[in-house]
Amino acid sequence: MSDNHRLDGKVALVTGAGRGIGAAIAVALGERGAKVVVNYAHSREAAEKVVEQIKANGTDAIAIQADVGDPEATAKLMAETVRHFGYLDIVSSNAGIVSFGHLKDVTPEEFDRVFRVNTRGQFFVAREAYRHMREGGRIILTSSNTACVKGVPKHAVYSGSKGAIDTFVRCMAIDCGDKKITVNAVAPGAIKTDMFLAVSREYIPNGETFTDEQVDECAAWLSPLNRVGLPVDVARVVSFLASDTAEWVSGKIIGVDGGAFR
């Protein structure tokens, strides 16, 4: 691996890293030499398994519980990271929740539940990352391809919560320039995780009777590469954005959907 792609000597924090895309990101950053904080909200056992995998690959890691929908908890998470490893270089904000509901049925409680984590949570993750991070760091948020390129029925709350991230990134990249910190986001499409499989039929017209195999076929059909996206596909892009190679990339939203929406 090119030295510019290595992360030796770096400390990375990944939120929502107990499973799915977040877990893949944490492992990938560790494989490139970073020490990793695996943040989780509820899935302690899963997070500890991610830590074990990172350590088995030759670097250090620790799991820290925090609800990143709570700004005070986020601040404590960052401070604990710095206390444990001495400093902080990379923050990958991955915690998120999905929601479906027709406009007429969305309650204020559901709206607030989604925006608390997906939008407000990511904003304050970025704020605390800036406050705790060394000069030249990397902040990588998570948007969605439904945020800017594709309208999905009954998906306004989720898509809107992610659409704000695109604006955050463009503005935060300017604010963070004084510390030479880059700010970018990945915007995944259909990525095969347990969360996606739980809700994927909502994306497919009349898809409620589809088997998992049929869902995979639909997702693969959307991409000219004719396969389903995997968590490692997102992790590789995050690893690039975290590296020295991406020093001149900031304020960008990188689609990771295999060309599904062009």
Curated annotation (Swiss-Prot):
Q: Which reaction does it catalyse?
A: (4S,8R)-2,13,16,20-tetrahydroxy-7,9-dioxapentacyclo[10.8.0.0(3,10).0(4,8).0(14,19)]icosa-1(12),2,5,10,13,16,19-heptaen-18-one + NADPH + H(+) = (4S,8R,16R)-2,13,16,20-tetrahydroxy-7,9-dioxapentacyclo[10.8.0.0(3,10).0(4,8).0(14,19)]icosa-1(12),2,5,10,13,19-hexaen-18-one + NADP(+)
Keyword NADP attached: yes
Q: Where in the cell is it found?
A: Cytoplasm, Cytosol
List the Gene Ontology MF annotations in alphabetical order. Answer: versicolorin reductase activity
- UniProt pathway: Mycotoxin biosynthesis; aflatoxin biosynthesis
What InterPro entries does UniProt report for this protein, alphabetically?
NAD(P)-bd_dom_sf, Sc_DH/Rdtase_CS, SDR_fam
Stated induction or repression of this protein's expression: Expression is stimulated by gluscoe. Expression is regulated by the atfB, srrA, AP-1, and msnA transcription regulators. These factors bind respectively to the conserved motifs CRE1 (5'-TGACATAA-3'), SRRA (5'-T/GNT/CAAG CCNNG/AA/GC/ANT/C-3'), AP-1 (5'-TGAGTAC-3') and STRE (5'-CCCCT-3'), present in the promoter of aflB. Zataria multiflora essential oil reduces gene expression. Expression is repressed by curcumin.
Q: Where is the active site?
A: S143, S144, Y158, K162
Role summary? Cytochrome P450 monooxygenase; part of the gene cluster that mediates the biosynthesis of aflatoxins, a group of polyketide-derived furanocoumarins, and part of the most toxic and carcinogenic compounds among the known mycotoxins. The four major aflatoxins produced by A.parasiticus are aflatoxin B1 (AFB1), aflatoxin B2 (AFB2), aflatoxin G1 (AFG1) and aflatoxin G2 (AFG2). Within the aflatoxin pathway, with the cytochrome P450 monooxygenase aflN, the versicolorin reductase aflM, is involved in conversion of VERA to demethylsterigmatocystin (DMST).
Please report the name of this protein according to its UniProt entry.
Versicolorin reductase 1
Species of the source: Aspergillus parasiticus (strain ATCC 56775 / NRRL 5862 / SRRC 143 / SU-1)
Lineage of the species this protein comes from: Eukaryota, Fungi, Dikarya, Ascomycota, Pezizomycotina
